[in-house]
């Protein structure tokens, strides 16, 4: 049986960064924006982590994949 947490800790609602900043087109050349949605290892972060909507997550995903093909972003970041 799962135990309930005690205390007043309340999880903060994640805000869709793209919708909040009114970005209509996610450009694949804007690697600074796209790097917010990629992990340290180079993997695309899921919606539950970034807080983006489904529509904007699809835009981000296609932009990241285009940037990878154009060699603007790495497929894998091995440090």
Swiss-Prot record:
Keywords tagged on the record: Ribonucleoprotein, Ribosomal protein, RNA-binding, rRNA-binding
Keyword Ribosomal protein: yes
Annotated PROSITE patterns: RIBOSOMAL_S18
GO molecular function: small ribosomal subunit rRNA binding; structural constituent of ribosome
One Gene Ontology biological process: translation
Gene Ontology cellular component terms for the protein in this record: cytosolic small ribosomal subunit
Role noted for this protein: Binds as a heterodimer with protein bS6 to the central domain of the 16S rRNA, where it helps stabilize the platform of the 30S subunit.
Subunit structure: Part of the 30S ribosomal subunit. Forms a tight heterodimer with protein bS6.
Official protein name in the record: Small ribosomal subunit protein bS18
Phylogenetic lineage: Bacteria, Bacillati, Bacillota, Bacilli, Lactobacillales
């Amino acid at each position: 049986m799962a135990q309930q947490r005690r205390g007043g800790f309340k999880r903060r609602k994640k805000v869709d960064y793209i919708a909040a900043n009114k970005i209509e087109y996610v450009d694949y050349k804007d690697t600074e924006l796209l790097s917010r949605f990629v992990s340290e290892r180079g993997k695309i972060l899921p919606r539950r982590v970034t807080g983006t909507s489904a529509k904007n997550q699809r835009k981000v995903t296609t932009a990241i994949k285009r940037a990878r093909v154009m060699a603007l972003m790495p497929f894998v970041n091995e440090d």
